[in-house]
Amino acid sequence: MSFFPPQQQQTPQPLFQTQQTSLFQPQQTNSIFSQSQPQQTNSIFSQSQPQQTNSIFSQPQQQQQTSLFQPQQFQQQQQQLNQQQQQQVQQQLYLFTNDKAPANYSTKWADLHPDSQKLLLQIEEKILEHRSESQRLDQCSRLYDSSVSSEGFEFDASRIVQELGGINTAMDRQKAVLHELMIVAKDMLRNAEIAVRSFMMLQPRFPHWKQGGGVVSVGSQPSQGQGTNPAPASSGQQQAVTTTVQVSDFYRGIPKKPTAFLLQTVVRFEKYLNECRQWVEELEQLLALDSDKYSRHASLLESLPKVMSNVHDFFVHVAAKVESIHQYIESMRTSYLADQRRRGECHDPFLEADRRETAKQEAAAKRVHPTLHLPASTTSTQPSTQVAGLIASSATPGGSNPPQTSVPTSNPSSGAGFSFLNTPASGPSSSLFATPSSTAPTSSLFGPSPTPTQTPLFGSSPASTFGSTQSLFGQTTPSLTMPSQFGGATPGSGASFGSMTKSSRPKSRTTRR
């Protein structure tokens, strides 16, 4: 069967010619052979060229295709085929039958030679492979995705924009330089014009005497010596004189005042004055800051009560936080013990830890301090000047040291231990912001005292035995007893923050853990 309609009757052309285009040349597209069933006729499809449709068995010059399968022309085709085989010598055949005869459109698949069948199958595999690749390329989304191509494009575009920005900046810089040069050139031209104008106006007023006695001036001829007659001037000399007069008339008149030089000088002087003014303002600001710094020291003493109040509020806030933490820890301890009891474990690890801590404190209290054998009168005989509050602690060299927490002592008279957070001490201790009791063994940080017999920290404080010392924030009261550092804290003496005694620091009997 044929896939081409029968055309007009023409003379059958030979199947193979010398000038015929081969089927498997690399310069042209090969024809497609489709495999059919053994009972069907295999057809050969020729690919159309841009200007003409060349079949395998037709001449390239023909523009019409000739049907080779008409019954009345079959015998003539066989005769011409035999003639063509005789004419062609050693012609290579790619598609041939089992009888070594050339294949045509009417040749069946079973009649083809195995080599020809293998060649056709290879061609079909290549066609199917390229067809599947083209279909995958058509279905690939990256071909239609603009972001794939825009990534490199955006990078190149940003780089080009940066380069253009740099070029633009360089051009602006060069433009500024050229503008400055243009201004300088204009100033030079104007100054040169003013200089020439001034020269043309002032030269006639200052004649120059030559050696021969003649006078030379602009607009006049050189005069002759005394006693001689002037020679008549020629026409060329008269024309030169006229030109000189015209040029001098161009520069005559009232000169421009003030001159450009004076204007530039005034502008430059004004600019310098503005810079000096800025310097003066900066110096005044620095001096004002220094004066404020010196005046600030005077107000520090007045702001001390407010500072102490803020410190007290902060301590209260911290104590509240610590109390909340203690409550949370206690709740966690209770829940942990309940969980342990639920699991069948009855021992209390917290109780064992408390017992070990108590044993450590008792062992530390039994230790003998190496300075206990020293007499206590060597340090208590010296009078000490006490100032309440943080002033006492800031005045002493060792006042800045924080109080040691939970310091046990072997003797109640050896020193006053300071308890920060409910830590017991063996000796009497003083409270920081509350009124401590003189007989209570321990006192908390913000807890009340059983015997409120002492004045507050910033109230009226007792003074020393030798006289009355005025308090910083209260009134003066006479002292009844002389304070001793090793006999306990004197009420209102600022023992919580330190003492002014020089020899009290190196001879402290508090034990160190």
From Swiss-Prot:
Name used for this protein in its record: Nuclear pore complex protein NUP58
Single GO MF descriptor: structural constituent of nuclear pore
Keyword Repeat: yes
Biological process, per Gene Ontology: mRNA transport; protein transport
Residue span of region 6 X 2 AA repeats of F-G: 446-498
Disulfide bonds: none
UniProt domain comment: Contains FG repeats. FG repeats are interaction sites for karyopherins (importins, exportins) and form probably an affinity gradient, guiding the transport proteins unidirectionally with their cargo through the NPC. FG repeat regions are highly flexible and lack ordered secondary structure. The overall conservation of FG repeats regarding exact sequence, spacing, and repeat unit length is limited.
Subunit structure: Part of the nuclear pore complex (NPC). The NPC has an eight-fold symmetrical structure comprising a central transport channel and two rings, the cytoplasmic and nuclear rings, to which eight filaments are attached. The cytoplasmic filaments have loose ends, while the nuclear filaments are joined in a distal ring, forming a nuclear basket. NPCs are highly dynamic in configuration and composition, and can be devided in 3 subcomplexes, the NUP62 subcomplex, the NUP107-160 subcomplex and the NUP93 subcomplex, containing approximately 30 different nucleoporin proteins.
Cellular-component GO terms for this entry: nuclear envelope; nuclear pore
Source organism per UniProt: Arabidopsis thaliana
Compartments where located: Nucleus envelope; Nucleus, Nuclear pore complex
Gene that this polypeptide is encoded by: NUP58
